[in-house]
């Protein structure tokens, strides 16, 4: 079943010598259902007069899904990374500064949430885990710095792109002309991607008719 997440209000710093501050996840429509296997963990910020400390990851949180590569990205406003689909690796995304509009589509044929679409704003102090087979894209609402951990080292053959404005995706972005990489700008339609995945033996949903 899908995981349902409510909006959380942004907690304010109390000004005390030692406080635990949490930020919000702004969810489109008030609540959001996440595809099966997608996880959102809220982090704790320990702050005092010296600064702050945040644990971003622990092996005990996901002992069977360890990140072997971490990548830092900085994005200008209106940058869209994706949509991408991975056959093998899982992503673990942390926003360090700014915020990202996240778009997800479950393309796994055997998933309990196949075809489910989700959209929400990811702010700091949360870790978003996305399993293989869930299409995802990240749009920078503001200048944004993010850290992405992956379960496998980067392999271009495992990074499949889709046109961001393909109506069959059902994902809506704040602008019709985002800043894209050349590879994302030349991406195929969802139908073409699904046909290629099926030909390669991957169990994905049927192409739209």
Residues covered by each model-derived region:
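Conserved metal-binding segment of the jelly-roll/cupin
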Residues: 121-142
């Amino acid at each position: 079943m899908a995981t349902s997440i409510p909006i959380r209000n942004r907690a304010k710093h109390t000004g005390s010598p030692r406080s635990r501050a949490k930020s919000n996840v702004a969810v489109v429509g008030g609540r959001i259902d996440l595809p099966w296997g997608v996880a959102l963990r809220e982090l704790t910020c320990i702050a005092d007069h010296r600064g702050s400390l945040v644990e971003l990851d622990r092996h005990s949180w996901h002992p069977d899904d360890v990140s072997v590569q971490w990548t830092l990205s900085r994005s200008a406003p209106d940058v869209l990374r994706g949509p991408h689909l991975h056959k093998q690796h899982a992503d673990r995304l942390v926003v360090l500064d700014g915020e990202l509009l996240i778009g997800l589509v479950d393309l796994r044929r055997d998933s309990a949430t196949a075809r489910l679409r989700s959209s929400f704003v990811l702010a700091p102090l949360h870790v978003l885990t996305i399993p293989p087979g869930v299409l995802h894209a990240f749009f920078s609402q503001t200048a944004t710095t993010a850290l992405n951990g992956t379960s496998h080292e980067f392999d271009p053959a495992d990074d499949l792109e889709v046109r961001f404005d393909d109506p069959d995706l059902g994902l809506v972005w704040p602008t019709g002309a985002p800043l894209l990489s050349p590879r994302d700008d030349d991406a195929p339609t969802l139908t073409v991607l699904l046909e290629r995945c099926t030909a390669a033996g991957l169990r994905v949903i049927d192409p739209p008719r």
